[in-house]
Structure formats: structure tokens, C-alpha cells
From Swiss-Prot:
Transmembrane segments: none annotated. Belongs to the lambda interferon family. Disulfide bonds join C35-C132, C69-C166, C185-C192. GO terms for cellular component: extracellular space. This is Interferon lambda-3. Cytokine with antiviral, antitumour and immunomodulatory activities. Plays a critical role in the antiviral host defense, predominantly in the epithelial tissues. Acts as a ligand for the heterodimeric class II cytokine receptor composed of IL10RB and IFNLR1, and receptor engagement leads to the activation of the JAK/STAT signaling pathway resulting in the expression of IFN-stimulated genes (ISG), which mediate the antiviral state. It holds the Pfam family IL28A. The keyword Disulfide bond applies. The gene is Ifnl3.
């Protein structure tokens, strides 16, 4: 009889104390299956071609405007590998969000069709990054490192200091670094060294 009551008593004690049978840090939330960032290790040739066409059209438009920008917001020296693996999705999410925001605000009817597919792809990537970073924050909340904080602050600050044309130039110049290097690195997780 005591053997039958022991599991019930143990369950009652664990429930009453709100103890977890497995430590939280090792358990993934149920929604974790919704994080599918690994699918972006490489984009399809069709998607890359659409981005190449959009980049070319935007660069041509900027040249016609004779845009002069003193610096690039997103430095070529910036490398996500400098961050801890778990911080990389947050940094990439900020880059993708900025690219989306800038490209969505381009008011040129000639570019509407050209930007359609790239904007759709960037939106999909951004939504996956949001899901992954939210799940990660829930599973293991940690404050961001100083390096990540500085980078995120710099991106935020540039949005208020830079002209729309220079922001456009910067995110467009950084596009293939974002798609081919940064996205692949985040999608590869701890295999990106």
C-alpha cells in the first residue's frame, strides 16, 4: 500500500513546491519546434537572383541620385562570429529588420515589382529569427554582452542620424554579406566558427 501512495505523495509535493522534475535550462519549450532557422543555410538560386536584381536596381537608382555617404552603417569588419552563438540570431534579426524597414520605405514605383520577392523572403527570414530569439529568451534569459549591446545601439542610433538615402545605400551594400555570410552562420549554429 505504501508503494502505491509514494508516487502520489511525490507528485503532490512536487506540484505544491512547483518544482520541476527536470531543470528548466535543459528543457525546451513546446513551441521550440517552430524555430526553423536552419532552412536558411543556403537560399535558392531563384531567391539569390531576385536579390541580385533588386540590389542592382537600387544601386543604379542611388547612382542616379548622386548619393554621397560618409560611412557605411554596417561595417564589413563586423562579423557575427565575434558574438556568442546564442547572441547571433538577435544581431542578425536587427540587421534584417533594418533592411526590411529601409527597403519597405523606398518610394519608387519602378522598384515595386523588383522588390516584391526579396521583401517577401526577408519578411520570412525575419519572422523565423523573431520566433527563434523569443524562444531562446524564454528558455535561457541572459543579458546581452557588451559587444552585442554596442552593435544593437549603433544600428538604432544610425536610423536617427543617417539620411534615408545613406541608410538605403548601407543596407543594400551589406545585402549579400547578410544573406551569404551572416544568415548562413546563424543557420549553422555552433558549427559556424
Amino acid at each position: 500500500m505504501l508503494l502505491l501512495l509514494l508516487p502520489l505523495l511525490l507528485a503532490a509535493v512536487l506540484t505544491r513546491t512547483q518544482a520541476d522534475p527536470v531543470p528548466r535550462a535543459t528543457r525546451l519549450p513546446v513551441e521550440a519546434k517552430d524555430c526553423h532557422i536552419a532552412q536558411f543555410k543556403s537560399l535558392s538560386p531563384k531567391e539569390l537572383q531576385a536579390f541580385k536584381k533588386a540590389k542592382g536596381a537600387i544601386e543604379k537608382r542611388l547612382l542616379e541620385k548622386d548619393m554621397r555617404c560618409s560611412s557605411h552603417l554596417i561595417s564589413r569588419a563586423w562579423d557575427l562570429k565575434q558574438l556568442q552563438v546564442q547572441e547571433r540570431p538577435k544581431a542578425l534579426q536587427a540587421e534584417v529588420a533594418l533592411t526590411l524597414k529601409v527597403w519597405e520605405n523606398i518610394n519608387d514605383s519602378a522598384l515595386t515589382t523588383i522588390l516584391g520577392q526579396p521583401l517577401h523572403t526577408l519578411s520570412h527570414i525575419h519572422s523565423q529569427l523573431q520566433t527563434c530569439t523569443q524562444l531562446q529568451a524564454t528558455a535561457e534569459p541572459k543579458p546581452p554582452s557588451r559587444r552585442l549591446s554596442r552593435w544593437l545601439h549603433r544600428l538604432q542610433e544610425a536610423q536617427s542620424k543617417e539620411t534615408p538615402g545613406c541608410l538605403e545605400d548601407s543596407v543594400t551594400s551589406n545585402l549579400f554579406q547578410l544573406l551569404l555570410r551572416d544568415l548562413k552562420c546563424v543557420a549553422s549554429g555552433d558549427q559556424c566558427v
